[in-house]
């Protein structure tokens, strides 16, 4: 997993409010990070954080009430040996959860070794789940794509095309028809799972849509709260093409896809020409995609129907068919 720039300080700052974290020791270790080789070998966030485990000392160690109880039952010699082995390998930080006070000797050892020690009143299981989700998100593959990302009929749709084809104008028309804006111009996509990619708007461009001749429009202010979305999963890409595009197929026999972060996303191409109602065409493409996801393929059904008709006609013209 890629965790460049992820240090104890940034993790604390991003999660302190949600987990009610307090930094009680090891303030000098604010720049402590995951071991590079360990992070590269990790296949998921579950490898990066968990309950106290001396076999995997390089991950974030979370100590709940059972772990602290076990620690306090150890002899002083065993405490020094086990914690010494753990801290020697420099875990990113330790978290004492369940509202338990960290043992004084553990706090002192963290201070001397500059190992960050956090406390949280939240249960250790909840702390682990939250940190795993956080690490999954910040280490997930991501890319920024150019276009207008919309929520159309509950489906995330990215409208792409060359400059000057009217992507933003089309987006404005769709918003006026009751659909929602996620992002304009630059869309940040993150692959959060094996089969879905989430798109968001960069904070700087939140709620804004640029239309030639009108400038920047604040969609939330103009159309209201329901006209914007914070995030959507991308399911369809609409590629706007010029009328003289020689690669355009009027009736494509095979579905078209565009690779986004290693995941094929269904794509349709729409020609831009005077008099064409692009908003209606995009809505129809979305409805057709919804049917395809439900297993209904209109083109395939038509081809099956045509094949059956041709076979019936061929049978009627055969000698055996005429005898019948």
UniProtKB/Swiss-Prot annotation:
What domain of life is recorded for the organism? Bacteria
What Gene3D superfamilies is this protein classified in? HprK N-terminal domain-like (3.40.1390.20), P-loop containing nucleotide triphosphate hydrolases (3.40.50.300)
GO MF term (any one): magnesium ion binding
Specify where the region named Important for the catalytic mechanism of dephosphorylation lies, as residue ranges.
271-276
**Gene Ontology terms describing biological process:** regulation of carbohydrate metabolic process
Give the keywords, sorted.
ATP-binding, Kinase, Magnesium, Metal-binding, Multifunctional enzyme, Nucleotide-binding, Serine/threonine-protein kinase, Transferase
**Binding residues for Mg(2+), per the UniProt record?**
168, 210
Name the cystine pairs: none
Q: Name a Pfam family for this protein.
A: Hpr_kinase_C
Q: Where is the active site?
A: 146, 167, 185 (proton acceptor), 250
- Known InterPro entries for this protein? HPr(Ser)_kin/Pase, Hpr_kin/Pase_C, Hpr_kin/Pase_Hpr_N, P-loop_NTPase, Ser_kin/Pase_Hpr-like_N_sf
Kindly list the positions annotated as binding ATP: 161-168
What cofactors are annotated for this protein?
Mg(2+)
The Enzyme Commission number assigned here is 2.7.11.-, 2.7.4.-
Q: What else is known?
A: Both phosphorylation and phosphorolysis are carried out by the same active site and suggest a common mechanism for both reactions.
Subunit structure and binding partners? Homohexamer.
Can you say what this protein is called? Answer: HPr kinase/phosphorylase
Q: Lineage of the native species? A: Bacteria, Pseudomonadati, Pseudomonadota, Betaproteobacteria, Burkholderiales
Gene name, please? hprK
């Amino acid at each position: 997993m890629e965790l460049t720039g992820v240090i104890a300080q940034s993790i604390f700052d991003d999660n302190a409010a949600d987990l009610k974290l307090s930094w009680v020791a090891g303030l000098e270790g604010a720049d402590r990070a995951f071991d590079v080789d360990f992070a590269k070998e990790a296949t998921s966030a579950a490898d990066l954080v968990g309950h106290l485990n001396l076999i995997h000392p390089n991950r974030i160690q979370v100590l709940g009430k059972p772990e602290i109880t076990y620690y306090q039952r150890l002899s002083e010699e065993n405490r020094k040996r086990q914690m010494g082995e753990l801290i020697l390998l420099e875990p990113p930080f330790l978290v004492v959860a369940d509202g338990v006070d960290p043992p004084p000797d553990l706090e002192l050892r963290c201070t001397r070794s500059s190992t960050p020690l956090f406390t949280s009143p939240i249960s250790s299981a909840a702390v682990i789940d939250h940190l795993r989700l956080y690490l999954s998100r910040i280490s997930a593959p991501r890319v920024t794509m150019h276009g207008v990302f919309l929520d159309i009929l509950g489906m995330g749709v990215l409208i792409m095309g060359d400059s000057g084809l009217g992507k933003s104008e089309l987006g404005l028309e769709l918003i006026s028809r009751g659909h929602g804006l996620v992002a304009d111009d630059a869309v940040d996509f993150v692959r959060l799972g094996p089969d879905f990619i989430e798109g968001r708007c960069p904070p700087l461009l939140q709620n804004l849509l640029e239309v030639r001749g009108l400038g920047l429009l604040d969609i939330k202010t103009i159309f209201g709260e329901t006209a914007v979305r914070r995030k959507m999963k991308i399911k369809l890409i609409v590629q706007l093409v010029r009328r003289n595009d020689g690669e355009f197929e009027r009736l494509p026999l095979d579905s078209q896809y565009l690779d986004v972060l290693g995941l094929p996303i269904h794509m349709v191409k729409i020609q831009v020409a005077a008099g064409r109602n692009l908003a209606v065409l995009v809505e129809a493409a979305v409805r057709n995609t919804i049917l395809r996801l439900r297993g209904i393929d209109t083109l395939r059904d038509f081809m099956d129907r045509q094949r059956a008709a041709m076979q019936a006609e061929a049978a009627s013209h055969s000698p055996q068919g005429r005898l019948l």
